Amino acid sequence: MSFEKFFNTAVSAWMSQEGPDSDIVLSSRIRLARNIVDFRFPTLFSSEEAMQIVALFERTFAYRSYGGAGRFELLKMSELQPIEKRVLVEKHLISPHLAEDSPFGACLLSENEEISIMINEEDHIRIQCLFPGLQLAEALEAASELDDWIEGHVNYAFDERLGYLTSCPTNVGTGLRASVMMHLPALVLTQQINRIIPAINQLGLVVRGTYGEGSEALGNIFQISNQLTLGKSEEDIIADLHTIVQQLIAQERAARQALVKTLGIQLEDKVFRSYGILANCRVIESKEAAQCLSDVRLGIDLGYIKNVSRNILNELMILTQPGFLQQYAGGALRPEERDVRRAALIRERLKMEERRKMEGDER
């Protein structure tokens, strides 16, 4: 398979589109946790009940079209190869928990990959909508419409006083988890992030790494989400998160301008050194690749680097993960082989960018 063909089939729509404030906010995600009446929750249900739930959703929703999202495909975890599951995690379409710890887990995935419905994870279903940039309200509207459509076919576990019943007490109520993925290199470089994270946590929000709980903030990418849902409306949860995100955007932009003033040519040098490494390296580990990609993305946003797509960070942060590298290679790779393949893939992506620029100039 040619790189261009692999790239075009591997990249989800949200990765290659730009949304509001997409210089800092990479994506907005809404997730709704729901359970079905007459079935025990996943923490207690039997294997037979788990299979019945998968069968219910396969029978009711698989291969049906939904609006502009296209048809739903049902992916059963037991039928996927480890590399295939890893790729789904790397694209943020399923959780590591569903991939690794749910033998009767499944996922309904829309054609455009903006919608995924995890089945038999921590709850019977978890509805997820992903949008580029800062679009929490739009993502909530899309998730709510999908939720209503699903509820037209199944009965949810709902309590008049408590709201939607979920396995984890922190999700009881709306069952809503809203999150944004943010690129905050200047706040990291100026070390302001060290005081900002505890302050955000005190406001009832959670700051995590790229792949959620327990993961590292590779490439200066942070995930900010709400923690509690009981006693708050969906709109209140979104508004609270949106306010904090707007403040973070303002702080990051101010920190970037401060760095330009104080570091000047040193900052520009840092950006171009990282670009040089990515364009020419033959071996690169994931941590170094993530840091270099973050530097290059910052350079694009500051206008140092021209004619390179801003979305290169979104795309390559995912395409250079182990699952994707092995999918591109067509089989399992040892860590040192992945480092060679990662370097080659990054060089190919940058060459593709150059070809697009040349074609644009010729027109």
Curated annotation (Swiss-Prot):
CDD domains: bacterial_phosphagen_kinase (cd07930)
Domain Phosphagen kinase C-terminal stretches: 24-255
Task of the protein: Catalyzes the specific phosphorylation of arginine residues in a large number of proteins. Is part of the bacterial stress response system. Protein arginine phosphorylation has a physiologically important role and is involved in the regulation of many critical cellular processes, such as protein homeostasis, motility, competence, and stringent and stress responses, by regulating gene expression and protein activity.
Top EC class of this enzyme: transferase
Gene Ontology molecular function terms on file: ATP binding; creatine kinase activity; protein kinase activity
Mechanisms controlling activity: Appears to be allosterically activated by the binding of pArg-containing polypeptides to the pArg-binding pocket localized in the C-terminal domain of McsB.
Disulfide links within the chain: none
HAMAP family: Prot_Arg_kinase
Keyword Kinase set for record: yes
Swiss-Prot/TrEMBL keywords: Allosteric enzyme, ATP-binding, Kinase, Nucleotide-binding, Transferase
Protein name: Protein-arginine kinase
Organism per entry: Geobacillus thermodenitrificans (strain NG80-2)
Underlying gene: mcsB
GO cellular component, one term: extracellular space
Enzyme Commission identifier(s): 2.7.14.1
PROSITE patterns xrefs: PHOSPHAGEN_KINASE, PHOSPHAGEN_KINASE_C
Reaction catalyzed: L-arginyl-[protein] + ATP = N(omega)-phospho-L-arginyl-[protein] + ADP + H(+)
InterPro entries: Arg_Kinase, ATP-guanido_PTrfase, ATP-guanido_PTrfase_AS, ATP-guanido_PTrfase_cat, Gln_synth/guanido_kin_cat_dom
Entry's family note: Belongs to the ATP:guanido phosphotransferase family.
A GO BP annotation: phosphocreatine biosynthetic process
Residues that coordinate or bind ATP: 27-31, 92, 126, 177-181, 208-213
Pfam families: ATP-gua_Ptrans
